[in-house]
Amino acid sequence: MISYFLNQDFSRKKQGRMAASGPKSSGPRGFGRRTTVGSAQKRTQKKNGEKDSNATSTATNEVSGISKLPAAKVDVQKQSSVVLNERNVLDRSDIEDGSDRLDKKTTDDDDLLEQKLKLERENLRRKEIETLAAENLARGDRMFVYPVIVKPDEDIEVFLNRNLSTLNNEPDVLIMGAFNEWRWKSFTRRLEKTWIHEDWLSCLLHIPKEAYKMDFVFFNGQSVYDNNDSKDFCVEIKGGMDKVDFENFLLEEKLREQEKLAKEEAERERQKEEKRRIEAQKAAIEADRAQAKAETQKRRELLQPAIKKAVVSAENVWYIEPSDFKAEDTVKLYYNKRSGPLTNSKELWLHGGFNNWVDGLSIVVKLVNAELKDVDPKSGNWWFAEVVVPGGALVIDWVFADGPPKGAFLYDNNGYQDFHALVPQKLPEELYWLEEENMIFRKLQEDRRLKEEVMRAKMEKTARLKAETKERTLKKFLLSQKDVVYTEPLEIQAGNPVTVLYNPANTVLNGKPEVWFRGSFNRWTHRLGPLPPQKMEATDDESSHVKTTAKVPLDAYMMDFVFSEKEDGGIFDNKNGLDYHLPVVGGISKEPPLHIVHIAVEMAPIAKVGGLGDVVTSLSRAVQELNHNVDIVFPKYDCIKHNFVKDLQFNRSYHWGGTEIKVWHGKVEGLSVYFLDPQNGLFQRGCVYGCADDAGRFGFFCHAALEFLLQGGFHPDILHCHDWSSAPVSWLFKDHYTQYGLIKTRIVFTIHNLEFGANAIGKAMTFADKATTVSPTYAKEVAGNSVISAHLYKFHGIINGIDPDIWDPYNDNFIPVPYTSENVVEGKRAAKEELQNRLGLKSADFPVVGIITRLTHQKGIHLIKHAIWRTLERNGQVVLLGSAPDPRIQNDFVNLANQLHSSHGDRARLVLTYDEPLSHLIYAGADFILVPSIFEPCGLTQLIAMRYGAVPVVRKTGGLFDTVFDVDHDKERAQAQVLEPNGFSFDGADAPGVDYALNRAISAWYDGREWFNSLCKTVMEQDWSWNRPALEYLELYHSARK
């Protein structure tokens, strides 16, 4: 009740003050405020004939806070008007003096009332606090707050009884605290003595609007604390945010801060870019000016001989009318036909230029007979041509001929000296050359501008196409799981709800009466922990999917989930141990980067022998582009192509294995590479493979690489080793290095080709945490191998990709016309013509079959030979590029090349060597690329072919089966991968199998050109880069660390 009256008094006072300070009327100053005092109100009302009782009522209501001021104010204003009208002689100064006296009295009365109410409130506050102090003291509680119910965005007082505290002997007592579990707005205040007995101290604090809890301790400003027996003091705050609201508030604050920092960073980058642009522009101007000076000097030097030879006429040979002319004038140049070798020519032509032919042939004009009447016919046969003197000409240069350019046979060139005429009215020479320099400079600048515009447009388009491809691939990656799980919306947004739809019919939970969803975020590490198990409900349609909905937090970057048959467990579908993970966009948190270290003995382009080198470089780049950290440890061969290594510098050295090992660091294709250079000469052999002690060399390297990581303080999340050559990393690490602080590191091992080093591969399979090979189908084909069969639970097939920057028809310097899927027909037509011209094939519209391969039995050489003859029978052209490591096979193909050159020289060409530029042209110019491998772990040829719009014709094996979907037979299989059919394939390893695919392909080219062109466009738009494989490898890396 006390609190009620206290608040009521305060509101009354507030209302009274508001009324008293309201806007004045248009009457004289002072009269509008007389209503606030009761006695003044009475006198005014009596003058207007009103009852005393009304006046008394008005005054009483005013004191009690019942506001009737607006009506009283109107009355006063009316009276003011009457007084002025009746007396009409009042002096304004008298009125103002009276007004001031009334104002002062009103203000004094208000102040007195306010002080009285303030005193009453303070007394009531003190009584309440004293009561609380006594109650807490009686209970032995040394601390309390006032008011007892603490609300956000208000002030409170904190009281401490020093006598009951561990600070009872301390002269100074301070409070130190913060809000919301010590996470928001820390504070420190000094406590002061109060009027309450028993040594109560207090201070005033403001509660922020975001607070749900206040946490604090007391201390003496140094090292003595009262922290509530190590539990800290806390006060709950009512009526504001709860913990979840505050967490979301923090996330929103962080998001705003990130946006602000991003804008600031973008502005800094813009300024840096502008600075770079200005510096580059300045350098370009200086370079162009220097080039213009040099070019001008060169022209000046070249012109001097012509100036020395130049004359105004040659007696009885030629002359010019008028004789005094300047640049851009039209003159007549006369020539005596009888003066030289053109006496008997039917036609005369002038082929000319200027300034010693600076612009080459720029004047071509036919002469006509002058028919001069005053000239003796015996002395000459004069002809003339009207010539416009070129602008800027100092000298005119010419010869005479019996026909136009490319049609003349006989010339008069002044005895091989050419004819040169001075321009009489020319600019002063220095001024002319200054103008010439400026003209050259302006042209260089314009050429540079146009070139930069083309390059900029091309770069922007390349970046746009790359981003669109990556976005499209991610969407297809998500949709490819739709037969098992997908979400609505497909793109999961942080801060929004998402519905997860699951089809148990296609999983281990098929037929189970219930399906339960278990999820979390950020790879099961989210601060809120896992979501409670949710029973999934049937969808509204008749499908076998079930669904549930979850709210995605603002700080999520990944959604994680598994499914089970019961709330408390039972059978789980966890995607074979990988769990289901879907990316979240728009969150304020980013996925912490993994640190991956590849230990390998091949790397493109510095030391590449086979596909392993491509994978190491391309996979590393793709993972790095996803914002993870990648290093590569590599032998420093003496045969490395150093021109591809940037910023190579000595890093350190260490001793191991009885020798010093020097470490160098450089960048290859934007990747961080550590080169190990043991001083025992193991890698100074001039080759990567081929030494009798290869196993020992690479075993030493693997151990040295692990020692380097240990001594260098590296703590990678993943060590990725490849094939037999770096397989020892797996067991050496587990045997010797896990106890040295590398306990969190996991081993991933990739098999590129099981043909070599089976024993080492088998041992690596045992020790690796996860193992992969280069395609799902090859993984199935080798699953029965004894070195793999015992480890299928950790063995995965992930298709390789290609590097879209290396294989890019839009930015390929080896093809005549850059192209994308938008102009694939025109681009490939130009490439085919160039290919035919370069190889001496007939330039005609033939279907071209390209074969780019190593000539080994694995690649199906007997099928290649058959395909060559079949293509020629179908009136096609064949281009083969490749060589054989086996001399017998090489000689066999040399004989075949000679035979084809004799019998089909205009339609077949075998280039039996490796030629990188030619391979690009074949991919671009061929209609089909044939890959008839007997087995193929992955295969890159068919992927590159599709990148260039060439349709693959392949045998169904390994990675060829995983990437090529037959246009007639694989529509459903392609649809499951969210792809369109993209080629022709066959099963057998014999001639009928090749014929079945090749004949259908060539017939499609002949019979349905428009459909075939659309197929070329389709295959170009499919993404066979590392975008998707990189995502799958990251899932594998995280699974290894789980």
Swiss-Prot record:
Gene Ontology molecular function: alpha-1,4-glucan glucosyltransferase (ADP-glucose donor) activity; alpha-1,4-glucan glucosyltransferase (UDP-glucose donor) activity; identical protein binding; starch binding
EC number, UniProt record: 2.4.1.21
Span of the transit peptide along the chain: 1-44
Residue pairs linked by disulfide bridges in the UniProt entry: none
Localisation: Plastid, Chloroplast; Plastid, Amyloplast
Keywords: Amyloplast, Chloroplast, Coiled coil, Glycosyltransferase, Plastid, Starch biosynthesis, Transferase, Transit peptide
Metabolic or biological pathway, per its Swiss-Prot or TrEMBL entry: Glycan biosynthesis; starch biosynthesis
Compositionally biased intervals (Polar residues): 54-63
GO cellular component: amyloplast; chloroplast
Domain of life: Eukaryota
Tissues in which the protein is found: Expressed in leaves and flowers.
Pfam name, any one: Glyco_transf_5
Gene Ontology biological process terms from the UniProt entry: amylopectin biosynthetic process; starch biosynthetic process
Catalytic activity: [(1->4)-alpha-D-glucosyl](n) + ADP-alpha-D-glucose = [(1->4)-alpha-D-glucosyl](n+1) + ADP + H(+)
Binding site for ADP-alpha-D-glucose: K608
Region (Disordered): 1-63
Coiled coil regions in record: 247-302
Enzyme class at the top of the EC tree: transferase
Disruption phenotype: No visible phenotype under normal growth conditions, but mutant plants accumulate increased levels of starch and have starch granules with alterated morphology.
Protein purpose: Involved in the synthesis of glycan chains within amylopectin in leaves. May play a regulatory role in the control of starch accumulation in plastids.
Assigned protein family: Belongs to the glycosyltransferase 1 family. Bacterial/plant glycogen synthase subfamily.
Name used for this protein in its record: Starch synthase 3, chloroplastic/amyloplastic
Organism: Arabidopsis thaliana (Mouse-ear cress)
Primary gene name: SS3
